[in-house]
């Protein structure tokens, strides 16, 4: 059975609940979502409850609720090599959603610019001061 968003490619950047929930909605409706997680443990993976109240990076209820139906890769978006990976993935995406500090988001947005126009659609979840 086809889904409404079949064929849509979405890149999710950041480890917060808001970006994970947004990405989950796209995935639930058939989009191909690639979650780019930070090298440090993301916020979503740290949130309890955990089975038997014992922390485990892959077993938190919030992570299991919001990070299913996605592919995942760990990338440091602050490094040049990380930006290259994100540029390659993002160049094939229809949409990029991110919840990272504004200065970091602006750096990433600039890698998708072609002159004065963006090459892909980008949505930032939480506006923050630069």
Question: Where are each of the predicted segments found?
Answer:
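N-terminal helix-loop segment corresponding to the beta1-alpha1 unit
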Residues: 1-130
């Amino acid at each position: 059975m086809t889904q409404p968003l079949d064929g849509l490619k979405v890149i999710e950047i950041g480890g917060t609940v808001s970006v994970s929930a947004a990405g989950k909605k796209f995935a639930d409706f058939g989009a191909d979502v690639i979650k780019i997680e930070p090298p440090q443990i993301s916020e979503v993976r740290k949130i309890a409850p955990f089975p038997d109240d014992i922390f485990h990076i892959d077993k938190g209820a919030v992570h299991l609720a919001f990070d299913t139906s996605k592919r995942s890769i760990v990338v440091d978006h602050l490094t040049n090599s990380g930006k290259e990976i994100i540029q390659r993935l993002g160049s094939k995406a229809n949409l990029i959603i991110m919840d990272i500090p504004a200065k970091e988001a602006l750096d990433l947005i600039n890698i998708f610019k072609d002159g004065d126009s963006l090459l892909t659609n980008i949505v930032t979840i939480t506006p923050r001061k630069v």
